[in-house]
Amino acid sequence: GAILPPLIAAFASDTRIEDAVKGIFTPQPVPDGYIDHIGAPLTIRPVNFRANARQVASLRPHIVDMAPRYGAEFTMPLEILHGDLDATVPLDIHSIPLRDAVPHARLTVLEGVGHMPHHASPTLVIDAIDRIAATAGLR
């Protein structure tokens, strides 16, 4: 509603923002300077908070609508990298079903990694990009 975002913004603290970002990175540490670099405090401005809440609230219905088409419509090379300790989007919620729906998909489960594999395992992410490029004939 119209009242909740300003209230949340008024009572949000730097500590709450830091805790939220830490939760996204867990179990890896947040890189030095990351919170300032991405402008994390901007997320609690009422207009931004409201927009994000709307997007999150509408995400699941869109995924439910799209998921049955994954196997037929994903004809491009598909690499999925997912941390086994991702508490934001657990492995069995999206990546395993996506891999199962798309016969040519490759799922790499990163042990001990949370929601930010591109920070935790950048070399493996680059390797996946290189595999996709090679499969697509771009290398």
Identify the role of each PLM range.
Residues 1-39, 54-60:
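Helix-rich cap/lid subdomain of alpha/beta-hydrolase
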Residues 3-5, 73, 100-101, 135:
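Alpha-helix C-cap/termination motif
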Residues 17-22, 53, 99, 126, ...:
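Non-transmembrane alpha-helical segments in soluble domains
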Residues 28-29, 60, 64, 133, ...:
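Secondary-structure transition/hinge residues
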Residues 32, 40-96:
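Conserved serine/cysteine hydrolase catalytic core
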Residues 93-105:
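Active-site-adjacent alpha-helix of alpha/beta-hydrolase-fold enzymes
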Residues 102-139:
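Catalytic active-site module of serine/aspartate enzymes centered on a nucleophile-bearing elbow/loop
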